[in-house]
Amino acid sequence: MSKSSPIEPVSASDVSQQFRDPGLYLNRELSQLDFNFRVLAQALDEQVPLLERLRFLCISCTNLDEFFEIRVATVRHAQEFGLPPAPDGMRPTVILNAVHDLTTKLVHDQYNCWNQVLCPALASLGVGVLSHNSWNVRQKRWLRGYFRNEIMPVLSPLGLDPAHPFPKIFNKTLNIVVVLNGIDAFGRAGHLAIVRAPRSLPRIIELPQHLSRDGSQNFVFLSSVLSAFVGELFPGMVVKGAYQFRVTRNSELVVDEDEVENLALALRNELVTRGYRLAVRLEIAEDCPIPIVRTLLQNFGLQENAVYRINGPVNLSRVSQVYDMVLRPELKYPPFNPRTVRNSDHIFEIIAKGDVLLYHPYDAFTAVLDLLRQAAADPDVLAIKQTLYRTGKDSTIVDALIQAARSGKDVTVVVELRARFDEEANLGLADKLQEAGVQVVYGVVGYKTHAKMLLIVRREGRKLRRYVHLGTGNYHSGTARIYTDLSLMTANAAIGKDVHQLFLQLSGLAPKMKLECLLQSPFTLHAGVLFRIERETTFARKGCPARIVAKMNALNEPQVVRALYVASQAGVQIDLIVRGACTLRPGVQGISENIRVRSIVGRFLEHSRVYWFANNGTPELFCASADWLERNLLRRVEICFPILNPDLAKRIYSDVLQSYLDDNLNAWELGSDGVYRKLLPETDHAPYSAQAALLESL
């Protein structure tokens, strides 16, 4: 529908009825699996350096693990409790079957990529990851000795009989089920045994180079060594078969925060049992006999649609260790030197003169570290307040906060204990900070604190001035080198006041307060996004140019999706850059033909969130910690901050939005059929990669 077509405003109830058709929505779980295919495509791209292709393969495997631990576990929960279907109309049982079909193809493609493409390519360049049948005599002799000296002493094989029931198997660990024939020392007839590989054992073993005939750097999987020599654990018995397997379990921690008095203690108790929760997936060697598979399924409480046959090591993601162990720069992305802030030794003076925008990893994260380090050492700084979601193991951020507290400054840190898979690390972090005198709070009951905020209060003359850092990504110097994220450092008084009020809400019992500049979940961000989408819709109905460009990691919030459909019908031109799952179906005639959705998958993980609204010639641009997901907009503490400096807003539009819309090398476009297709340069267009162009500009 063209933007000049007369469209009558519709009521909310009419909109709800109009967009009730399940065919207008894509399934979140299947869309998330689609993203893994796009990551895997990078592993097959011959333009990508070989060891980087290996890393992309491992990322796709790790992503799939987390998908089962969280998303599939959630769907199984919905199935168990008979929860209603999502807007796409798919019921949990249908979703699980569809997930199985799509995952089976993904797993096949992953192992085909490893066995047929990457492993042979690495071998041709002198990096061998050797299977059992390719060991030479000297390698096999060395590995037998390694097994006897380093592996065998820590193994505890368990024969299965009435006195030895099926053992507890920890989440995502390597195990071998062994079929035995013979009589043991106590006269028991052998049948099945389980060998668990302790997590203390290395999953990748490097062979001494002198064992190679051609000087190659060679590795073997622990699973290959176990399978080859497992018979030594059962002397006098015949091993009829040894099959590796791995079980994946529900890893979503569940704590009733309204019922617990001590959140940290409750989480510690949950973490103890997390590795043994309900199973959601069984990976098993493809040659394992069906009766044994059924035995495992029965013990794990799984159905046939939870089994995945594996043609290779069940823990394929562990081959990522080879990336770090092979020191071959020509097989990796070339290093780069990110931009640094000039005169960063005087960071407060720089920020006082004007807002500072950083686009990581092209701009170094060291500027953020400098800000905090200088604040910790500056006698004029009176207070520091910060949120921490993920920080990494050796965090300069944490060290600076501790230094500040020990120097007598008032330091308050909101540590989110429920950051997925970082709960244990954050519990330790909270303890460390508290021991140093930092006031630690755990956020708000019922809401994860996902906002990225740093507030520094500094005395300047007779006044106190607030300095603020806001970001789309974590305070994590490691991910800042491989994730794209935006940082704003500002001394803007209105923004500083808003951030101060947010910290009062998080650390105390302050009531909801009206903010001047920032939008905040769970209070104003959802409504603020809807308002701006509807404003563009109104402009389009009046015949004015109207446009929305938004970049995020994922999109599924139903009201936002419906508002975008209404905007499209009114003629608003909408470009969405959504890296991962997207439930909106673009390009549907009469509904969403004015919406285009693309996903960028390249060297760096796209992580920044940016919302741009044309606003009838007075554009508004926001950066945010939140995706357009239900959880982010309604069930988390998030921030969305405006870029008030017009020059900085133009830079973001150019480098972060338009640049990605021009990309024709790393872009995938979502069709109305729900299929992502890789874009290729047209004959009259030069090849263009947004990430490569930004690197070249350094």
From Swiss-Prot:
This is Polyphosphate kinase. It comes from the Bacteria. Mg(2+) binds at R390, R420. The gene is ppk. The active site is at H450. It is an enzyme of class 2 (transferase). GO terms for biological process: polyphosphate biosynthetic process. ATP binds at N63, Y483, R579, H607. One of its GO terms (molecular function) is ATP binding. Its cofactor is Mg(2+). The keyword Secreted does not apply.
